[in-house]
Amino acid sequence: MGVANDSSPEYQWMSPHRLSDTVILGDCLYFNNIMSQLDLHQNWAPSVRLLNYFKNFNRETLLKIEENDYINSSFFQQKDKRFYPINDDFYHISTGGYGIVFKIDNYVVKFVFEATKLYSPMETTAEFTVPKFLYNNLKGDEKKLIVCALAMGLNYKLTFLHTLYKRVLNMLLLLIQTMDGQELSLRYSSKVFLKAFNERKDSIKFVKLLSHFYPAVINSNINVINYFNRMFHFFEHEKRTNYEYERGNIIIFPLALYSADKVDTELAIKLGFKSLVQYIKFIFLQMALLYIKIYELPRCDNFLHADLKPDNILLFDSNEPIIIHLKDKKFVFNERIKSALNDFDFSQVAGIINKKIKNNFKVEHNWYYDFHFFVHTLLKTYPEIEKDIEFSTALEEFIMCTKTDCDKYRLKVSILHPISFLEKFIMRDIFSDWINGRN
């Protein structure tokens, strides 16, 4: 029997580097460099000592801090023009149902808590193994349309993230109570806290207070103030009431320019497109070509991403033309950016079986499931599409569904259109800007 490599489906079961009960997939140098900047064992004094610490402050002492000239601009929200990452810290950029994401330097670091009772560590590697497998098997420029993780660490102890979150939450609670002259308490109402935090988070006075208290109380190079309300919703969600935030995976990605959903008309034109709709055609066409090329691979006509939507498509610089051949046509992309599919956590391909997707789907699906969902989310994200009658009418061919066979944009029934449906679709004049290098 031959040795499996990362071009084979069996790659997901290999354990190239073992550290105790943990495993590293990919480049150890990248992984160890990032890990060397994390303190996974940091802990803090009991919360009661934090409460006693804040008893030393009142509205008058906080006012003196607010009058100070010092301000750490990294404590503004990242969407604020005043935000600036003045330290080489981990900056929280997103928290979703399946991961907490940080940015550091030119990398993105994603922490994923895994329900170890449901899956073994090696059964949670799809986000690394599927894109790597596809990248190594695709032969043309279409491989550039995939985001591959640089490294992935399995079965790491991640309790520090939840502990850090609780420490920051307690700090914010006590700080806001002190600002309002209230009795100090670590009890809170989610609704009341979020309202108070959201009212203050953009205030320069509040940021000055954070500039003082975050280093003193938290003393960590992990900054979770940005989008803290998303982290709050994650950890405080009722479905995680009894969740054990014990172990999970750490995944390192290259840093993108934007996610596709962040592009508006102004940015689309800045990126070189004639209009926002032309930009949308661009990302649709590149994703369609990627799928078609994947389905051409042996045993890969079962590929599913299972979450194809604009915010799972990332934009990167493109320094040379991307040329993809399909039958007698040649699709040429001279744009300064490229789109790349990301977040393969629920994906499957060839012999790489993903138990997460297997448990979620009751009927058989193929590429059409993904594009049905993709078109729904495109139309929701970009109502401007309706202004282009030809394009919007064509897209409706993907969503001829009813409430009985579609729930929250996802197909509940099995519709297995052949990939030739998608091939014929992208040959239309809608995409003439890119066919045979016309652009």
Swiss-Prot record:
GO MF, one term, reads: protein serine kinase activity
Reaction catalysed by this chain? L-seryl-[protein] + ATP = O-phospho-L-seryl-[protein] + ADP + H(+); L-threonyl-[protein] + ATP = O-phospho-L-threonyl-[protein] + ADP + H(+)
Q: What class of enzyme is it?
A: transferase
Location relative to the cell: Host endoplasmic reticulum; Host endoplasmic reticulum-Golgi intermediate compartment
Q: Does the keyword ATP-binding apply?
A: yes
Query: Catalytic residues per the record?
Result: 307
EC assignment: 2.7.11.1
Q: Which domain of life is it from?
A: Viruses
Q: Which GO terms describe its cellular component?
A: host cell endoplasmic reticulum; host cell endoplasmic reticulum-Golgi intermediate compartment
Q: Which residues form the Protein kinase domain?
A: 87-439
Residues given in the record as ATP binding sites: 93-101, 117
| PROSITE patterns listed in its UniProt record | PROTEIN_KINASE_DOM, PROTEIN_KINASE_ST
* 4Fe-4S among keywords: no
* Primary location group: host cell
> What post-translational modification information does the record give?
Phosphorylated in vivo. Autophosphorylated in vitro.
* Matching Pfam families: Pox_ser-thr_kin
User: Which keywords belong to this entry?
Assistant: ATP-binding, Host endoplasmic reticulum, Kinase, Late protein, Nucleotide-binding, Phosphoprotein, Serine/threonine-protein kinase, Transferase
Record function comment = Essential serine-protein kinase involved in the early stage of virion morphogenesis.
Which family, according to the similarity comment?
Answer: Belongs to the protein kinase superfamily. Ser/Thr protein kinase family. Poxviruses subfamily.
Q: What is this protein called?
A: Serine/threonine-protein kinase 2
Species: Variola virus (isolate Human/India/Ind3/1967)
